[in-house]
Amino acid sequence: LGYPVIDVGTLLVPRGVGTMAAMFAVGRIGPRIDLRWQILLGMALTALAMHEMTQFSLDTSTWDITRTGIVQGLGLGFVFVPLSTVAFSTLAPHFRNEGAALFSLIRNIGASIGISAMVALLAQNTQAGHAALAEFIHPFSLALRQAVEVGAHDLSSAAGLQKLDAEVGRQAAMLAYLQDFRLMMWVALLGIPWIALLRKPASPLSAAGSPALAD
């Protein structure tokens, strides 16, 4: 979207605020509400945020990004904190240090695999989108002729052709991001049925109170 680095960092703050708020909420309601329902809420919020992100465009406002970031942060907070509690609830106290190390390792490996897959798909879909959009760049394109007539593009110079190619690349990258967001939305939705396989912890407070849960 062409935002400066400082603005990008500022737009990421609401997601962290949402995650922090969800963590505080989990600590308050954890003993009273089944943790599996909290994970379900988190997965649903994450899927909702991903769905909203599939509606993004190159003209998306900062408010839309901020609002979506808050929803996504709430979803992540309601997923990982209860999930950690459930994971350690049946683990003997003397195994919690080893369990925390293994839990963090698996989580980091999973995150690395997911990020790598999304980046690979992004690169592939960007190239495919660029090739598809480039097919509309020809002398008989009405939209292109109108853009040239109003001075948006200059096809008579190398600089103008480079600008046109950059715009095609920008549009292709946006489409690729939307495809990634759509895939992540389906991953979140498909993860919801697996919550039924989790056991209800007998004592959430005893598991959540362990210092070994910190990453």
Task: Say what each PLM segment does.
Residues 86, 103-200, 205-215:
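Hydrophobic transmembrane architecture of multi-pass small-molecule transporters
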Residues 1-98, 207-215:
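Transmembrane core module of solute transporters
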